[in-house]
A protein has these predicted regions:
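N-terminal glycine-rich, Lys/His-bearing helix-loop that initiates the first secondary-structure elements
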Residues: 1-3
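N-terminal glycine-rich phosphate-binding loop and ensuing alpha1 helix
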Residues: 5-176, 184, 195-204, 208-211, ...
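Conserved structured core elements
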Residues: 96, 108, 120-127, 152, ...
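Hydrophobic/aromatic beta-strand patches that form the interior of the parallel beta-sheet core
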Residues: 96, 115, 147, 176-178, ...
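Fold-independent oxyanion-binding glycine-rich loops
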Residues: 100, 151-152, 180-181, 216-217, ...
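Short acidic, glycine/serine/threonine-rich loops at helix termini
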Residues: 107-110, 157-163, 187-192, 243-247, ...
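Conserved beta-loop-beta/alpha segment of the NTase-like Rossmann-fold superfamily
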Residues: 167, 172-271
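Catalytic core of tubulin tyrosine ligase-like
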Residues: 227-232, 240-244, 249-409
Length: 410
């Protein structure tokens, strides 16, 4: 049963957003239903955050969090891997692919995962990731549930593409799609913008919104039904990463941690990656732009840099603990952005400078609400080939070079 106009007015009045129905009388039936659906699914309680913007940005006391380094991992590889394989065979591990983005920065109008990195034959980003996951499926002789998070913009294209390619050999019964929730975009007073007469201006709810999006899309029913206890969440733009890596899973389980985070040794103290740390004694990530010179040059007891391990957006979460933090409110990040909007005359304006706020929740806040986290070092040139740009650093070019180095035929 969808929301009625009266219910929508009631909800809007509660948050002082009645203006979004200004053009309701001009809309056709389909558009009316569209805006009512949007009003129903939009979390407006977050708009209160504008009033407390300053409190949200405060960081606590930052101290180092030691990573499990390669030598310790190698010494225990067999044991860790056996534990991880056992968990996979028991159906306790699932993977979540964050694939809501478009390939815009690569000059493509398609979903990011549809980008072709091949040279002599087609090799798509989705294909690279599924191939990597298939290696574990063969190793464990067991299928792993793969949840794919799409967005409003790319959902249909993503599903059609993967079906057309027969999921690159993956068992379709183990692939589940869900859409990332959207958060409203507002002016500086916290009033929601309209992007069309029948459409609120919205943007994805940040990389920390994936679990609540799973929940609201009914995916947790599958998680509970299948007895899934661990979720490995990873981003679409790193074509070399190991997914549902048994050694990583086993190490996290054996160390009794509720989160594992794959990390790489930084290639320079000022490299633009977030760094694992403790904040007020709890696991956290300090973003590269928050690292002071003092932190950047701090040393641990061995004389090594204390904040030396960058995160690569590949995390293993314990489901039970994720559900616990979902009962609490996730902290919000308020980001100033340029937001296209309808002006008083109903004309679309595309601003050249920031004119409002978008609201995001971030993975680092999920980690900070957890009691323990294992930073797990991986070899950079074997597991980290991010594609953020067309050329240069972290680009299609650099990823092709790394794929070739790792024996992938392009």
């Amino acid at each position: 049963m969808s929301m009625t106009l009266e219910q929508a007015k009631e909800k809007l009045a509660k948050y002082g957003q009645e203006h979004v129905l200004k053009y309701y009388g001009e809309l056709n039936e389909e558009e009316k239903q569209g805006i009512l659906d949007q009003i129903e699914t939009t979390d407006m309680s977050i708009l209160e955050a504008c009033k407390h913007k300053e409190d949200l940005a405060k960081k606590g006391v930052i101290t180092p969090l030691a990573a499990m380094q390669l030598d310790e991992i190698e010494a225990n590889r067999e044991e860790f891997t056996a534990t991880g394989i056992e968990a996979i065979r028991q159906g306790k591990v699932a993977a979540v692919l964050l694939a809501g983005g478009m390939g815009t920065r690569l000059g493509s109008d398609n979903p990011m995962g549809m980008y072709n990195v091949g040279l002599t034959h087609e090799l798509y980003i989705f294909e690279c990731l599924i191939n990597n996951l298939m290696e574990v499926v063969h190793q464990a002789d067991s299928w792993i549930h793969l949840f794919v998070m799409t967005s409003d913009k790319n959902n249909d294209a993503t599903i059609a593409f993967l079906k057309e390619h027969d999921f690159f050999g993956y068992n379709a019964e183990y692939v589940h799609f869900f859409k990332q929730e959207m958060a409203a975009a507002t002016d500086y007073e916290g009033k929601i913008y309209l992007e069309e007469k029948g459409k609120l201006s919205t943007s994805p709810n940040g990389n920390g919104g994936w679990f609540i999006s799973m929940k609201n899309n009914g995916m947790l029913d599958i998680v509970h039904r299948e007895g899934i206890e661990w979720i490995n969440v990873f981003a679409v733009d790193n074509v070399l990463q190991r997914i549902a890596d048994p050694c990583f899973i086993g190490a996290t389980i054996q160390k009794n941690c509720v989160v594992g985070s794959k990390v790489v040794r930084k290639n320079a103290p000022d490299e633009k990656v977030g760094v694992m740390c403790l904040e007020d004694g709890r696991p956290s990530i300090v973003e590269y732009y928050e690292l002071t010179d003092e932190l950047m040059n701090a040393k641990d007891e061995k004389g090594e840099p204390a904040y030396n391990y960058g995160v690569i957006l590949n995390y293993l979460f314990k489901v039970q603990d994720l559900e616990k933090i979902m009962a609490e409110k996730m902290p919000l990040h308020i980001v100033e952005k340029k937001i296209p909007y309808l002006d008083a005359a109903g004309e679309l304006v595309k601003p050249d400078t920031p004119n409002g706020y978008k609201f995001e929740s971030l993975v680092l806040d999920m980690i900070h609400q957890m009691d323990s986290c294992l930073p797990f070092e991986v070899v950079r040139r074997k597991e980290f080939a991010p594609i953020k740009n067309k050329t240069g650093v972290d680009s299609v070019e650099s990823a092709r070079e790394l794929l070739t180095e790792n024996g992938v035929v392009l």
